[in-house]
């Protein structure tokens, strides 16, 4: 049995084949995502940035790349919402603003950055630390005092002033970069990247791409500790992992919303470094051995035996080959189980042909931390983690979406999922093991903190996602803040609106048919599509996923301005009915009515 380590690098990534990277077979080049990405490609700036608590961001790498467009700048309200959402305990964010020569903001986004390096592994049932505890998860949590992350912004003529602010509001630092200067400073960087990727192979994971990276969650598998002769094994491992990852809810219901890619970067040696480790749990397996790998994978990070990490700066630079990434999973070929979650999350995989439930559960548990901001629900009073409270008015003190110190029904963040017949607090398991209530014992404390589910994946990684967990993953997918695009996945496919112009001019009495194509899981329930004129709803219809909705607007009196908006609502039952409108997306047209003489004018693009 080949045991292999999977380094789930949730620091976000993607890939596009360049001249130095071996091309996949012709058939794989024709997958839907690659076709759409090439069709809508546009130039972008790609930076790797380092920052620390109280230390201003510094650019350590720059490259101009091609990305799937169009880029959509976040509005001020959405920026504020995402920034507030990133002040929680799991992470904070970098606020990114690109300005033109007049100082006007022409593009802005939020980048989510983890605050913690986690080691959460599943102990054997007979392990001494498993006895007398409500979980087999063995947790070690370390604060990240420095962060490395990627910034991607579109190339816009006349806009070279990039401002990056980092950290929680009370400690936020900022720096401004001249992108033209960075381009000159890093001239030749592409040659350096190409040399580091000599012999690399990039391809889509067969059967796991569905559309443009501009409107999907793009997961990149990055090979570490695989030699040039190990490409076959890397394919087997990642094929199986993608299949297993997408086989459980909520992912299985939203398979069309994810793309999987892989980049095999050959290493000279197999596995990862195993330094001598002071951890008393160290089993001294091949300790003191070192191997030459592409991303410097090593065990015993921070003195914790199974804490496996890679050089995130090197990984992010390599990922510039496909800059559409949202999540990186670095697969480390090793016989020793280990892992971490943070800027780069790591977990082990027993066998590339099967992927054990233990490994799958830990990977999805870490994904839930980083992608959906979910908190741990198990008790471990040795965990060194910041306290939280939903009783305070300061949002930076609030707890994660699935845990709380609120003990009464009306104050529960997940009260919409709690049946009126369920007592709060809840003391016994419910007949439906995934149903919501309020059980005491959560977020490492056995009293004073409450969890939303009796026993789900955030309490025991062998358990499924509960209803609140599932919804939070989908809410995060739709609201964004985790990659590119920063605004999340849309229920309206980008690039399908007609007319494509955001601003139109019509003559009095003229008509125009407005339309766009919907996007939701298929098979699945129809979407509810609402049309608004100046914020007054004028039509509601039921539209099958992937179908187009249209509305014909007739221009009234000359000299007036009208706003027409299409709103598409995902009706999947994994989203509570009260949540669905909150994550719906819209397409908007502004129409000016002239006094005549303009048969049909389009302004903008």
What is each stretch, according to the model?
Residues 171-203, 576-602:
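Short beta-strand elements
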Residues 24-198:
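Extracellular glycoprotein-like low-complexity segments
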Residues 19-22:
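Boundary at the C-terminal end of the N-terminal hydrophobic targeting segment
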Residues 200-216, 222-227, 239, 243-383:
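Active-site-proximal segment of zinc-dependent metalloprotease catalytic domains
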Residues 7-16:
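Bacterial N-terminal signal peptides
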Residues 158-160, 558-564:
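Exposed beta-strand face motif in extracellular beta-rich ectodomains
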Residues 149-151, 547-551:
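Short strand-edge motifs at loop-to-beta-strand transitions and within beta-strands
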